[in-house]
Amino acid sequence: MIIRIATRGSALSLKQTKIVMDRILEFNKDVEFKLIIVKTTGDVDLSKPLYEIGVKGIFEREVNQAVLRGEADVAVHSLKDMPAQISNDLTLVMTPPRDNPRDALVSLRQYTVDTLPLNSIVGTSSLRRRGFLLSLRRDVTVKPIRGNVDTRIRKLNNGEYDALIMAAAGLERLSINANVSEISPELMPPAPGQGIIGVVARRDRDDLIKVLRRSSDEETFKEAAAERAFLSRIGAGCHVPLGGLALLDDGYFDFTYGVVDPDGVEKFINSTRIDARNPEEAGRVAAEDLLRNARGLVARLLKYS
């Protein structure tokens, strides 16, 4: 079987695709691959923060279109970039084992959020990271930053920023581990799906789905299902400052979730254990708790997203 894989062309996307291919080959020996490189709107328009472009699934949509058009068999994504709602003709079919779900502060001197110098300039284009950081450090200036990982690190080294906030998983996949300080999910709840690579295929490809499901990590797949159900119930897209992390432990999800306004003035964060027998229901339970405690804030954020 030859599997045509649609992916973005960045170093991180290609590394994630390699992880997927290696995982598939562990469980299916008679498989070959062909890469279909897709350039997305998010790759082309680097002039604005993602939340100002105003397109849902800015990194996901065009890659999935290659599958819908029959040009590729599957699409590979950072699951955190994939909206809760995708085409009805597509489905999430595989997740390799999850990598580190946390956010990380990257600096030249291994600062933590607490030890960042007063009035530091911190780079991120994520409203979620911006809001939770400002809720902890009102003195810092958050400056948007775009581009691939190497570009961002170069801007840090050039002195344009004192620190960056990035996904720990992406740094680890590219073997960037110097001067990295992880941020606790209780302080900055990660984006739903962060640290997970998602593989999407057409619903009607039973032959392909069988191969891919055999290669999937079930624990990670359940965590993905819970977090995406959480995101779906809130009704939020990738540009709402919302975090949700469900980690399986002995039949329960340790679920940490939160929401914050972009200026860090108002936030809600909670951690709880929820029965994991039905991952989608667990995600909805977490979402209902967040809505009970922060309904007004969520409504305002959704209105302007």
Curated annotation (Swiss-Prot):
GO molecular function, one term: hydroxymethylbilane synthase activity
Pfam families xref list: Porphobil_deam, Porphobil_deamC
The keyword DNA repair belongs to this UniProt entry's keyword annotation: no
UniProt xrefs under InterPro entries: HemC, Porphobilin_deaminase_cofac_BS, Porphobilin_deaminase_N, Porphobilinogen_deaminase_C, Porphobilinogen_deaminase_C_sf
Cofactor(s) essential for the protein: dipyrromethane
PTM annotation (S-(dipyrrolylmethanemethyl)cysteine): residues: 238
Name this polypeptide is given: Probable porphobilinogen deaminase
Principal EC category: transferase
EC number(s) recorded for this UniProt protein: 2.5.1.61
Organism: Caldivirga maquilingensis (strain ATCC 700844 / DSM 13496 / JCM 10307 / IC-167)
Record function comment: Tetrapolymerization of the monopyrrole PBG into the hydroxymethylbilane pre-uroporphyrinogen in several discrete steps.
